[in-house]
Amino acid sequence: MATRQSSYNYEEILSCGRGELFGPGNAQLPLPPMLMVHRITEISETGGAFDKGFIRAEYDVSPDDWYFPCHFQGNPIMPGCLGLDGMWQLTGFFLGWLGEEGRGMALSTGEVKFKGMVRPNTKLLQYGIDFKRVMRGRLVLGTADGWLKADGETIYQASDLRVGLSKEKAA
């Protein structure tokens, strides 16, 4: 496994998508176009809203992003599920960053609130993930609350994001 850093650039995040950052069979981000993170600006095992660790990350929005022409024609909006998936991606990344082993999977979320939209004129998305707990058992389970800001305004909030790492072999 790579040395734990406090931030990651785009190339380092892509290496996680290729399965190189945390080692084969361990936490892995999706590759573009499903990758919803361009930079991890800060990651820590302590601090955050619950003092159990946090991640702060960013995604640069482009009017040319793949989802705008199809969602919806004449009214382009980034699907809210992509922002939620970005929160799950970061929750799983945190578990791999802690050194936990296994393949990641989004499991659930308690509540999601959408208060705004990402449109082609949006420039920057910022993520905040604050960890409540990490449980280690048959699978490693991370639970966190998250938010997404579009150009500085909080537009999504999610509570009890849950991501697990399982050591089961891939199909």
From Swiss-Prot:
Belongs to the thioester dehydratase family. FabA subfamily. Its EC number is 4.2.1.59, 5.3.3.14. The active site is at H71. Pathway: Lipid metabolism; fatty acid biosynthesis. Homodimer. Its main location: cytoplasm. It is found in: Cytoplasm. The keyword ATP-binding does not apply. GO terms for cellular component: cytoplasm. It catalyses: a (3R)-hydroxyacyl-[ACP] = a (2E)-enoyl-[ACP] + H2O; (3R)-hydroxydecanoyl-[ACP] = (2E)-decenoyl-[ACP] + H2O; (2E)-decenoyl-[ACP] = (3Z)-decenoyl-[ACP]. One of its GO terms (molecular function) is (3R)-hydroxyacyl-[acyl-carrier-protein] dehydratase activity. One of its GO terms (biological process) is unsaturated fatty acid biosynthetic process. InterPro entries: FabA (IPR010083), FabA_FabZ (IPR013114), HotDog_dom_sf (IPR029069). Necessary for the introduction of cis unsaturation into fatty acids. Catalyzes the dehydration of (3R)-3-hydroxydecanoyl-ACP to E-(2)-decenoyl-ACP and then its isomerization to Z-(3)-decenoyl-ACP. Can catalyze the dehydratase reaction for beta-hydroxyacyl-ACPs with saturated chain lengths up to 16:0, being most active on intermediate chain length. This is 3-hydroxydecanoyl-[acyl-carrier-protein] dehydratase. Keywords: Cytoplasm, Fatty acid biosynthesis, Fatty acid metabolism, Isomerase, Lipid biosynthesis, Lipid metabolism, Lyase. NCBIfam families: fabA, PRK05174.1.
